[in-house]
Curated annotation (Swiss-Prot):
Binds 1 [2Fe-2S] cluster per subunit. This cluster acts as a Lewis acid cofactor. Its cofactor is [2Fe-2S] cluster; Mg(2+). Mg(2+) binds at residues 81, 123-124, 499. The modification N6-carboxylysine is found at residue 124. This is Dihydroxy-acid dehydratase. It comes from the Bacteria. Belongs to the IlvD/Edd family. [2Fe-2S] cluster binds at residues 122, 195. It comes from Shewanella baltica (strain OS155 / ATCC BAA-1091). Functions in the biosynthesis of branched-chain amino acids. Catalyzes the dehydration of (2R,3R)-2,3-dihydroxy-3-methylpentanoate (2,3-dihydroxy-3-methylvalerate) into 2-oxo-3-methylpentanoate (2-oxo-3-methylvalerate) and of (2R)-2,3-dihydroxy-3-methylbutanoate (2,3-dihydroxyisovalerate) into 2-oxo-3-methylbutanoate (2-oxoisovalerate), the penultimate precursor to L-isoleucine and L-valine, respectively. It is an enzyme of class 4 (lyase). PROSITE patterns: ILVD_EDD_1, ILVD_EDD_2. Homodimer.
């Protein structure tokens, strides 16, 4: 039987000092010997997705203590990618993922916690905590802050739905009046919560459900809805149940590495492709798989992208549906249910929402779907749960409303979630492309690509940084038929692998959204749509071919064939490569870029791998 990790600091006379300190935190005589559950919160007033999390740790703690545990909360950092976007602040976003993972590891291991609840929400916080949880491999439950309500406003007497990207595009579009732009800005983000579309934050919170590490509704239940309160309480109860299974019953199925195994990663990626999730999820799943020692790679993602249909289309890929609509249609469990009916899901994997009593099928995703898939459940409480809807009242308060949709969206032919027969497309919403531009692959969110752009041939317009690209787009340098190439923005080259939401938004605002392509060794916001190809690997700073592209080069993109090709002969490419090598210390570096890179970012760049490895640390540089 495994011994409580916390016994290291609570048992024996030699730990009298440690016990004295535990007592000073509120631990009583009869508490010693109970499991100590760490609560990793990420409350901050900087981020709308986290501004309401201040009291969530206490809520989880109350359930833990009622179930017989000791709850101890700590906080970690959270960067708002939207606020950090478009300036030097974005250099810090992806590196913050590693800091979050490390900070959770440091706190949990320094204090010998027995189990963990992760209260996350936005872009790098859920992935960072996920990496830490799989690194630590102690019982864990994830519970996020939830998505914000979609914005709504009237323009030209027509009610429209809005999100953050609409505000950015309107602000850059000279054809939109100052009055309408201000109206959109004030309406785009009406409540607390992660941005309302299938952007990175919501994509990752959905994926934790598919990985088996969070409860049904985690990815889709609105932050403002009163029903979300129960998710926090249940997270506390579930983590205690998992801790008891592991420490009292020697049940290793309660550990995250036995839940999030290879099959679970396939389930998560299958969901991601089916719902057209953010391309950033590829980066984060690859990173999490490395922490879990799961051999899940770009090759697996490429294979799956050819098999999985696109069953759920959500903003930014369409203005019609947002996360509140996904929830009404059954949330993640609704999508997984449809995938199960197509034979594309592993349902024999363990899940934190299910009790494992040793009987066949218990504790698995199959039993969770039986209860929570709205198309098969007989549980009226579950149906009531998925009818939770928006109130349309601006607020920063969690659990502030209890509005319901009049009915569930069970329309699998024309609704938000479709059956395979009526899929938005028979190939999913993400694809891996490869070719001489990206020998190790690159990612495109096909859910956001217009059908007319699935194949594209154009002339390269090369920029050495996002800043130069923005200036070029706004200055009229980019014209229809161009392939905008933004390089030296990868994990090493940026450093930090900036998101390119501003360049794509500005292309849209100038009417070039369907007339141009954009490729980069950087990445894209979950809010990006259009022919935007990111994660080019190897990156320019690591000797990738993207560094050798010249203005006017012909670039051929063929998404159905999964190819991206620089139409330059091997002889010419080799000559360019030799010329680059001849530059010595200046080789594989941006020409003329003016950018301050702090010591912290330089340290990150020294160990960062390219995107095809998840942009994690290069372990070969750390291990003997």
């Amino acid at each position: 039987m495994p011994k409580l990790r916390s016994a290291t600091s609570t048992e024996g006379r030699n730990m009298a000092g440690a016990r004295a300190l535990w007592r000073a935190t509120g631990v009583k005589d009869n508490d010693f010997g109970k499991p100590i559950i760490a609560i990793a919160n990420s409350f901050t007033q900087f981020v709308p997705g986290h501004v309401h999390l201040k009291d969530m740790g206490s809520l989880v703690a109350s359930a833990i203590e009622e179930a017989g545990g000791i709850a101890k909360e700590f906080n970690t950092i959270a960067v708002d990618d939207g606020i950090a976007m478009g300036h030097g602040g974005m250099l810090y976003s992806l590196p913050s993922r590693e800091l979050i993972a490390d900070s959770v590891e440091y706190m949990v291991n320094a204090h010998c916690a027995d189990a963990l609840v992760c209260i996350s929400n936005c872009d790098k916080i859920t992935p960072g905590m996920l990496m830490a949880a799989l690194r630590l491999n102690i019982p864990v439950v994830f519970v996020s802050g939830g998505p914000m309500e979609a914005g709504k406003t009237k323009l030209s007497d027509k009610l429209i739905k809005l999100d953050l990207v609409d505000a950015m595009v309107a602000g850059a579009d000279s054809n939109v009046s100052d009055e309408d732009s201000a109206k959109i800005e004030r309406s785009a983000c009406p409540t607390c919560g992660s941005c309302s579309g299938m952007f990175t934050a919501n994509s990752m919170n959905c994926l934790t459900e598919a990985l088996g590490l969070s409860l049904p509704g985690n990815g889709s239940m609105l932050a403002t809805h009163a029903d979300r309160r129960e998710l926090f309480l249940e997270a506390g109860r579930r983590v205690m149940a998992l801790a008891k299974r592991y420490y009292h019953q020697d049940d290793e199925s309660a550990l995250p590495r036995n839940i999030a195994n290879f099959k679970a990663f396939e389930n998560a990626m299958t969901l991601d492709i089916a719902m057209g999730g953010s391309s950033n999820t590829v980066l984060h799943l690859l990173a999490a798989a490395q922490e879990a020692d799961v051999d899940f790679t770009m090759a697996d993602i490429d294979r799956m992208s050819r098999l999985v249909p696109h069953l759920c289309k959500v903003a930014p890929s369409t203005p019609k549906y947002h996360m509140e609509d996904v929830h009404r249609a059954g949330g993640v469990m609704g999508i997984l249910g449809e995938l199960d009916r197509t034979g594309l899901l592993h349902t024999d994997v363990f899940h934190v929402a299910a009790d494992n009593d040793g009987t066949p099928g218990s504790g698995t995703l199959k039993s969770v779907l039986a209860q929570y898939d709205v198309m098969q459940t007989q549980d009226e409480k579950v149906k009531h749960f998925f009818m939770a809807g928006p109130a349309g009242i601006p607020t920063t308060k969690a659990f502030s409303q209890d509005c319901r949709w009049p009915s569930l969206d069970n329309d699998r032919q024309e609704g938000c979630i479709r059956s395979r027969e009526f899929a938005f497309s028979q190939e999913g919403g993400l694809a891996v492309l490869s070719g001489n531009v990206a020998e190790n692959g690159c990612i495109v969110k096909t859910a956001g690509v217009d059908e007319s752009n699935l194949t594209f041939v154009g002339s390269a317009r090369v920029y050495e940084s996002q800043d130069d690209a923005v200036a070029g787009i706004l200055g009229g340098e980019v014209v229809a038929g161009d392939v905008v190439v933004i390089r030296y923005e990868g994990p090493k080259g940026g450093p930090g692998m900036q998101e390119m939401l501003y360049p794509t938004s500005y292309l849209k605002s100038r009417g070039l959204g369907k007339a141009c392509a954009l490729i980069t060794d950087g990445r894209f916001s979950g809010g990006t749509s259009g022919l935007s190809i990111g994660h080019v690997s190897p990156e320019a700073a690591a000797g990738g071919t993207i560094a050798l592209i010249e203005n006017g080069d012909r670039i051929e993109i063929d998404i159905p064939k999964r190819s991206i090709k620089l139409a330059v002969s091997d002889v010419e490419l080799n000559a360019r490569r030799e010329k680059m090598h001849s530059l010595g210390p200046m080789a594989w570096k941006p020409i003329g870029r003016q950018r301050y890179v702090s010591l912290a970012l330089k340290a990150y760049a020294m160990l960062a791998t390219s995107a095809d490895k998840g942009a994690v640390r290069d372990r070969s540089k750390l291990e003997d």
